[in-house]
Regions:
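Catalytic-loop region of hydrolases
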Residues: 1-99
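Glycine-rich nucleophile elbow surrounding the catalytic serine of serine-hydrolase chemistry
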Residues: 174, 201-214
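Alpha/beta-hydrolase active-site loop
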Residues: 139-143, 149, 166-189, 211
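Alpha/beta-hydrolase-fold enzymes
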Residues: 211-295
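Short beta-strand/loop motif that positions the catalytic acidic residue
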Residues: 334, 339-346
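Gly/Ser-rich "nucleophile elbow"/oxyanion-hole loop immediately N-terminal to the catalytic nucleophile
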Residues: 94-97, 102-103, 181-203, 220-224, ...
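Short, surface-exposed "cap/lid" segments of acyl-processing enzymes
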Residues: 80-147, 158-160
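C-terminal catalytic histidine-bearing segment of alpha/beta-hydrolase fold enzymes
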Residues: 312-326, 339, 348, 355-450
Length: 450
């Protein structure tokens, strides 16, 4: 895929200055109300990844327990799925007051935002004072903290953009990669163009991470991505929406449709033509709720009761089939090695969808190790897979661990001495987080480990 429009200059606009903003220890505003998120005049003239402004921020566990890390937020120039210039925010994190090791790696971690509502964006949900109960990124801090504790720099982008475009194609990858570009140019992080970069995300974050890995060869070939961990990625959002309708997880169907209608005029027209007023109200409400509340409110919701034709028939109309084809993962092969992890008995994302994504990569000579866990389900595997993901990334940062084992079925990834050591390490990190103690390495010796 080409990105010829991405570096276009706008000579009629002056180049905006890079500027630092003061946070003044204030209660964070929602992104839609925070002027920090609004790009300055002339930002379109800058290349993707250019930092427009930055600010120091305090991060917190569930918005309440201030974390002992160094963190900034960067507003940077990026592109939409239609290659229109826009601005996005990434939150970059370092261990507090730890001397930078030689060749510190950068991890691009993607949260499972899984919502349209901006209270679920990690740039808001992870801040001290955020009122974001029910936002999934708050539950992912243990994984982020575990990476910080290793001395890694971490970039956590708002990969859905400022409009909350959940399950939109391609543009999550653009925002993630441009967030990496922004982080690598941000002097306080001590990174440079030779910095090794890893990608990691689970569920909705695994989907966004897949887009970053798929878009990187054409969009950001200069970034040295050494590996990507794709945990339980939403491989086929269209099939997911159909499968979850009327189930305990049908809130995700509502959120997905509410998001995609913003991105595709043809889909929006079909929805307006066939879904009744009550169904429209459900979609409107889903766009305002966090993931947990939407899931609880719309559990068992059956959109067949709100369509003048069956949902299956509605979703086979050409305008909608085209959308579903567009959002399906595996249509571009990543250049980096990948570790895909998925539960065999996932109650949300069908393992067959992920099998198909992996097969599409392998058919195009992609470098994939695929681990299928027979004991876990979707929610538990997020934490249970963390030691495997972290150790695999550690090896990739060191330049090892590139065997191309295509399919690795396991009874449980938790049943190994290495996994147990990993869980104990994460538990110790979380204890430090709860006590607001430093997360990073503290000794001169540990400062040089990856």
């Amino acid at each position: 895929m080409t990105t010829g429009a991405t570096n276009e200059r706008k000579p009629e606009q002056a180049r905006p200055p890079r500027e630092e903003w003061e946070t003044r220890d204030q209660v964070p505003l929602l992104p839609s109300r925070d002027p920090f998120y609004q790009p300055p005049v002339g930002f379109r003239a800058l290349p993707p990844g250019a930092v427009l402004r930055w600010r120091r921020v305090d991060l917190a566990l569930f918005g309440r327990i201030r974390q002992h890390v160094d963190a900034w937020q960067l507003l940077y120039r990026t592109n939409s799925m239609h290659h229109e210039p826009e601005a996005a925010v990434t939150t970059v994190v370092l261990p507090a007051r730890v001397r930078a090791p030689a060749h510190r790696p950068l991890l691009a971690y993607q949260c499972a935002i899984d919502a349209v509502a901006d209270k679920c964006f990690p740039s808001y949900a992870l801040r001290y004072g955020a009122r974001a109960i029910g936002a999934v990124p708050q539950f992912e801090w243990p994984l982020i903290a575990a990476a910080v504790a290793r001395g890694w720099a971490v970039s956590i982008s708002d990969h859905e953009g400022q409009d909350g475009c959940f399950v939109a194609p391609r543009e999550p990858g653009y925002r993630i990669l441009d967030g990496v570009r922004a982080a690598m140019s941000f002097e306080p992080l001590g990174l440079d163009q030779s910095t090794p970069v890893g990608i990691w995300g689970y569920s909705g974050g695994g989907m966004a991470s897949s887009w970053a890995a798929e878009m990187a060869p054409a969009y950001a070939p200069e970034i040295g991505i050494v590996g990507a961990v794709l945990g339980a990625p939403v491989s086929d959002p269209g099939q997911l929406a159909v499968r979850l309708n009327g189930t305990a997880f049908s809130g995700l169907t509502a959120i997905g449709i509410a998001s995609l209608r913003r991105c595709y005029a043809g889909l929006d027209a079909r929805i307006n033509a066939h879904i009744d007023a009550e169904g429209q109200q459900i979609l409107a409400a889903a766009s305002q709720l966090d993931t947990v509340r939407a899931g609880a409110r719309f559990a068992k919701q059956d959109f067949n009761n709100h369509c003048d034709i069956s949902l299956a028939e509605l979703l086979t109309q050409p305008e909608i089939v085209e959308v579903f084809d567009d959002v399906r993962l595996g249509q571009h092969v990543p250049a980096c090695p990948m570790l895909v992890i998925h539960p065999q008995h996932d109650q949300i994302i069908d393992v067959r969808d992920v099998d198909a994504q992996v097969q599409r990569y392998l058919a195009a000579d992609g470098h994939v190790s695929y681990v299928r866990d027979h004991c876990s389900e979707h929610i538990s595997l997020m934490l249970l897979s963390a030691p495997l993901a972290l150790n695999w990334l550690k090896n990739r940062f060191r330049g090892t661990g590139t065997s191309n084992a295509q399919n690795i079925p396991v009874f449980s990834i938790a049943l190994s001495a290495k996994a147990i050591r990993g869980y104990l390490s994460i538990l110790a990190t979380m204890l430090r987080a709860v006590l607001a103690r430093p997360l990073g390495p503290t000794t001169a010796r540990s400062q040089h480990r990856i």
